[in-house]
C-alpha cells in the first residue's frame, strides 16, 4: 500500500554491530535492542521487496563523534541495496522527498541533480564508491574534494 500511494519511508538502520549502544546481555533493554535490530532487517527487506520510496535518515549529526560515522552507517545499507541504490537514496531520492516540504523547503533550487540552476553540492571520491561502497566510510582519506554551496573545502 505504501508503494502504491507513493508514501516515503525514512529509516535509520539499527544494527547489532560496532555502532550499537552497548547494553548488558540479558537485560530488558538488550532484549528490546535485539528485537529492534531484527525489525530493522524486516523493514528494509519489505521496503526493498515492495519498492517503497525509502529515504536515508540518521540522527547522529547532533553528536560530533557519531557524525563521523554517517558514511559507515550509509555503507551498511548494502545489506539490502546495491551500492548504486544506496548512493542514490542518500542523494537524489532524499532530494525528491525534501522537495515535498513545500513552503517549508529552505532550498531555493533543485537538489540531488547536477544541472544548471540546481544546488549541487559535490563530493569527489578517490576510487569508485559503486564498486567499493566502503570508500565513503573514511571521508578524511577518500573524499578528495568537497564542494558545498559552490565553495570548495
Q: What do the predicted segments below correspond to?
A:
Residues 1-38, 55, 60-61, 126:
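Active-site core of metal-dependent hydrolases
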Residues 5, 50-53, 142:
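A short helix-to-beta-strand connector/capping loop
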Residues 37-129:
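His/Asp/Glu-enriched, well-ordered alpha-helical/loop segment
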Residues 106-107, 139-141:
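Short, small/polar residue-rich loop motifs at catalytic or cofactor-binding pockets
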Residues 130-135:
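Short, Lys/Arg- and Gly-enriched loop/turn segments at beta-strand edges
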Residues 146:
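Short aromatic-centered micro-motifs
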Residues 149-150:
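Glycine-centered positions in the ABC transporter ATPase nucleotide-binding domain
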